[in-house]
């Protein structure tokens, strides 16, 4: 293990990057959750107990030096790019002014909110920089749950109990702490996870979660709301199905699929010839969550559901690459001028 650490430390120290993209490739190779350093941390459990302290210090030092070196490479690459931009001919004729248009994520977010508003849901908002209690503990996440791992969550360096929220469930927690049932809210917002950026994943994305708490709320109520939402969003012919799943904050839990809106449920490459496409997770609110937030779980019940806005936008407008939503490419964004 020591030889592997020293070898990797030397290898990283020799890395160079001429562009920001090359620096990002190095970060993914060495620092992502499936990278070289993560694999060493996985193997740490095999180290003899008498060597764990020394090896642990070496691993932490390796990770810190790798982050410093790759960040330095990124900053130098950015500085070089800025210098090149500064050499642009300032006497050159400017581009004509263009009128802006609404972003596709904003369009879909508004449509989702309008659908739930027709069902009597109000909109709730909360901070993006959150504490551990509202993001994890109140939502019934165990202390050793993988979502708490630094590979998945952005922690504040000097305040490990302060994080960037990984889901908008934290807003549900805050609403339940301050409001007694009946509660009927949706919680749209931006969330963050420590993911390598690719066509199907990003370090930030947008969610809408819904919460309904009252007396005698049942899974049948949830299913009817899901069917209404799917048909309003994707068309009256849309069918839904629910599959058993697991989430810490709901019990029972399910994932919802809709009939593929491209092939009409007949089967195509987009739906992998199943005729179904997954769009959201849902379930009955776990009694522990209600109790954590000061609501009597013996008196009240509720349901919750959550979806990624990017996922819904992908399906609605058939966008195959998540990166398009954050790259500010006018050729892409102007395609939505006619969408209202």
From Swiss-Prot:
Q: Which UniProt keywords apply?
A: Aminoacyl-tRNA synthetase, ATP-binding, Cytoplasm, Ligase, Magnesium, Metal-binding, Nucleotide-binding, Protein biosynthesis
Q: Which residues bind Mg(2+)?
A: 251
**GO annotation (BP), single:** phenylalanyl-tRNA aminoacylation
Cofactor: binding details:
Binds 2 magnesium ions per tetramer.
Chief subcellular site? cytoplasm
> What highest taxon heads this organism's lineage?
Bacteria
| Gene3D superfamilies on file | Bira Bifunctional Protein, Domain 2 (3.30.930.10)
Mind telling me which GO cellular component terms the entry cites? Answer: cytoplasm
Q: Does the keyword Hydrolase apply?
A: no
Q: Which InterPro entries match?
A: aa-tRNA-synth_II, aa-tRNA-synth_II/BPL/LPL, Phe-tRNA-synth_IIc_asu, Phe-tRNA_ligase_II_N, Phe_tRNA_ligase_alpha1_bac, Phenylalanyl-tRNA_Synthase, tRNA-bd_arm
Q: What class of enzyme is it?
A: ligase
Q: One Pfam family from the UniProt entry?
A: Phe_tRNA-synt_N
One annotated GO molecular function is:
tRNA binding
Its needed co-factors are:
Mg(2+)
User: Does the keyword Transferase feature in the UniProt annotation?
Assistant: no
Q: Where in the cell is it found?
A: Cytoplasm
Task: List the PROSITE patterns.
Answer: AA_TRNA_LIGASE_II (PS50862)
Catalytic activity entry: tRNA(Phe) + L-phenylalanine + ATP = L-phenylalanyl-tRNA(Phe) + AMP + diphosphate + H(+)
Assigned EC number: 6.1.1.20
According to its UniProt record, which protein family does this protein belong to? Answer: Belongs to the class-II aminoacyl-tRNA synthetase family. Phe-tRNA synthetase alpha subunit type 1 subfamily.
**The protein's assembly and partners:** Tetramer of two alpha and two beta subunits.
* The name this protein goes by in its record: Phenylalanine--tRNA ligase alpha subunit
Q: Which gene encodes it?
A: pheS
